[in-house]
Structure formats: structure tokens, C-alpha cells
């Protein structure tokens, strides 16, 4: 598949950017719908998105560049070239959380409420965004003989982008079900962190393009830490809530 969708005045518009934009748009619409359901001012979510999107893109790129510094140290101008990919979701999430914390403090609203509202939209956006990896022929796995393998450079490989798409869609529907059953604020977001990280840990083990730190796959290290932190925060916040009541 041609990664270039069309050209405007000689400028190539790539499918990767179109798909990522579609993911962001769908995620935002889901968040706005959830804010309306909870009676929150939708402008609060729109303003948050305006700040979080550029912060997330910068965070995603910095994360990717840091763990590929051997290449980028000799190709500094390529650091700002993101049209062909090179964005790491963990960098996005870290930057988005920091942005959300600052935004919540400035607006004097609960960070955990904002996080719960945006969590389903975030995972839906991630699911859609994985198709950008398909177009770019990236984020695929090791060779396989399984019937659903895809051909990349003449080799049949695991479609790990598709595994993550399916997992993320499953997490999306779980969050929609759980949002009306949470015990305390923040649990929808923390469940998102846990479930996404569990899936990412196992899927990452099949990939051949993982960001590495020494001999370790960075995404697996971050995923394990995220599961532990998410679970600990759920337990802590539930106990804290019980003490208050």
C-alpha cells in the first residue's frame, strides 16, 4: 500500500497522519460525550485536548528519539521529521498525564475526573492509530507460519499492530462497561493503564522493532511498572475512600 494518500501543491499527505488524526478526533468525540453524560463543561475537555495533543506528540517523539539516539545523534534534522512515523505511545501518555495534572491544578478541577472521562477515548484513539503502523509497514512481529500472518518484505510475520488493535478495542468496551461501576474517581483511567499495559507487555514480546534499554524491551519494562503502579493506586484510593466514609 502506498503510504502517501495524496499530494497538495507538491506536499505529500501520508495515510499515517490521516489515520492518527482520525484516532485523535474519535477519541475527543468520545471524551466530549462522556463529559456531557457526567454534566461536566465540555469546554474543559476541549481546552485540555488543545494542550494535550501537541504535548503528546512532542512526548512521543522525544521518547522515541531518546531510545534511538545512536541514529539521531548523527541525523539531528530527522528529529523533527514525524511524517513517516517514529512516535512512541508511552511518551505520549507520560506527556499527556503531566499536561493533565498541570491543567487540572490551573482549572481547579479533579485530575482523576478528567482522567476517567478521557480514558475510553484515549484507548479508542490508540486502536485506530495502530492502522497507521500497518500503512507504514512497521510495528510487526517475528516470522510465523500461522494463517493470519501478513507478508512484509517477502516474509510472513505476526501482525502485531492488529493484535494490539483488537486488544485495545476490547479494553475500550470494558471501560465503557466499567465506567458506571467504578468505586472511586480515577478507577476507569487506572483500569485503562493496567489493561493496556498487560496487552502491550505480551504483544511487545513478538515485535522485532522494540525500543531497547540494554537487553530489555523498554515497552515491557514500562508496562510492568504501569501495571504495578495502577494496581497500587486503585488499592490505595479505595482504602482512602473507605476511611473517609
Predicted stretch roles:
Residues 1-245:
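A feature for loop-to-transmembrane-helix boundaries and adjacent hydrophobic helices
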Amino acid at each position: 500500500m502506498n503510504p502517501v494518500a495524496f499530494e497538495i501543491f507538491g506536499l505529500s499527505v501520508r495515510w499515517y497522519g490521516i489515520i492518527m488524526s482520525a484516532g485523535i478526533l474519535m477519541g475527543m468525540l468520545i471524551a466530549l460525550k462522556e463529559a456531557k453524560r457526567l454534566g461536566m463543561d465540555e469546554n474543559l475537555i476541549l481546552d485540555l485536548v488543545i494542550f494535550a495533543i501537541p504535548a503528546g506528540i512532542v512526548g512521543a517523539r522525544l521518547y522515541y528519539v531518546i531510545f534511538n539516539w545512536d541514529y539521531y545523534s548523527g541525523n539531528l534534522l530527522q528529529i523533527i521529521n514525524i511524517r513517516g512515523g517514529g512516535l512512541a505511545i508511552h511518551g505520549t501518555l507520560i506527556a499527556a498525564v503531566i499536561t493533565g495534572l498541570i491543567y487540572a491544578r490551573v482549572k481547579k478541577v479533579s485530575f482523576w475526573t478528567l482522567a476517567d472521562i478521557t480514558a475510553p477515548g484515549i484507548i479508542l484513539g490508540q486502536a485506530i492509530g495502530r492502522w497507521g503502523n500497518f500503512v507504514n509497514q512497521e510495528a510487526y512481529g517475528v516470522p510465523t507460519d500461522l494463517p493470519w500472518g501478513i507478508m512484509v518484505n517477502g516474509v510472513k510475520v505476526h501482525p502485531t499492530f492488529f493484535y494490539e488493535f483488537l486488544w485495545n478495542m476490547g479494553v475500550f468496551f470494558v471501560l465503557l462497561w466499567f465506567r458506571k461501576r467504578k468505586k472511586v474517581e480515577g478507577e476507569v483511567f487506572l483500569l485503562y493503564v493496567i489493561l493496556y499495559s498487560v496487552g502491550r507487555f505480551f504483544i511487545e514480546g513478538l515485535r522485532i522493532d522494540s525500543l531497547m534499554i540494554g537487553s530489555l524491551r523498554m515497552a515491557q519494562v514500562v508496562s510492568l511498572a504501569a501495571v504495578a503502579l495502577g494496581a497500587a493506586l486503585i488499592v490505595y484510593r479505595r482504602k482512602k475512600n473507605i476511611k473517609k466514609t
